Design a protein with these regions (language model features):
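Core catalytic alpha/beta fold that binds nucleotide/phospho-ligands
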Residues: 1-161
Length: 161
C-alpha cells in the first residue's frame, strides 16, 4: 500500500493525490482544488500539464487515413474549409487543439464537438471562448496542443511510455 506524503513539523498536512472524476469524466484532485491537470497519450509518448486554473492538453500521433473520416463527422465547417487548403499535419494540429479545449472545459467529445472552431480563416485559432490555445513544438510526427485561461501559468511534462 502506498504511504501518504509526510509534512514537515509545524506545516499543514501534505495533500493527497487521490483523484475523482467530474460529471463528464474529467479527473481532478479533490484534496487540492488549487491544482488542475490534464493528461494525454498517443503513440509512444505521454504528456501532463499542471496549472493553478483549468487546463487541457492533447497529444496526437500523425497517423494515416483519419483526416476525412474524422473531419466530416466532428469538425466545424470553418475547420473543414481551412483544412482543404492545408497540409495533412494541420489536421492533427486542429484535432489536438479541439481536444485540448474540451479537456479544458471538461465537456469531452460529444455532439457539440462540431459547434466550435479551432481554426481561424487562414490559421489555427489562438483562442476559443476566451481560453488561449497554443500548439507546442514537440516531435515532427506529433501534434501537442495546450488550452488554458493563461498559457504562461502552465507546466508541461512529457516522456516516452
Amino acid at each position: 500500500m502506498p504511504s501518504q506524503p509526510k509534512s514537515a513539523p509545524g506545516q499543514p498536512p501534505a495533500p493527497s493525490w487521490r483523484t475523482q472524476k467530474g460529471s463528464h469524466g474529467k479527473p481532478y484532485f479533490p484534496d487540492c482544488p488549487w491544482l488542475h491537470f490534464s493528461i494525454s497519450h498517443s503513440g509512444e509518448y505521454w504528456a501532463c500539464a499542471m496549472a493553478p486554473t483549468e487546463v487541457g492538453l492533447d497529444l496526437q500521433l500523425h497517423t494515416k487515413g483519419r483526416k476525412e473520416r474524422i473531419s466530416s463527422r466532428f469538425f466545424h465547417p470553418q475547420e473543414n474549409e481551412y483544412l482543404r487548403r492545408c497540409a495533412y499535419r494541420d489536421f492533427f494540429d486542429i484535432w489536438a487543439a479541439k481536444e485540448s479545449y474540451v479537456k479544458y472545459t471538461g465537456q469531452g467529445i460529444d455532439e457539440n464537438f462540431a459547434s466550435f472552431t479551432a481554426a481561424a480563416p487562414t490559421a489555427p485559432a489562438a483562442e476559443i471562448n476566451g481560453a488561449q490555445l497554443k500548439s507546442i513544438p514537440f516531435h515532427p510526427d506529433y501534434s501537442l496542443s495546450l488550452c488554458a485561461p493563461r498559457i504562461d501559468n502552465v507546466i508541461i511534462h512529457y516522456e516516452t511510455q
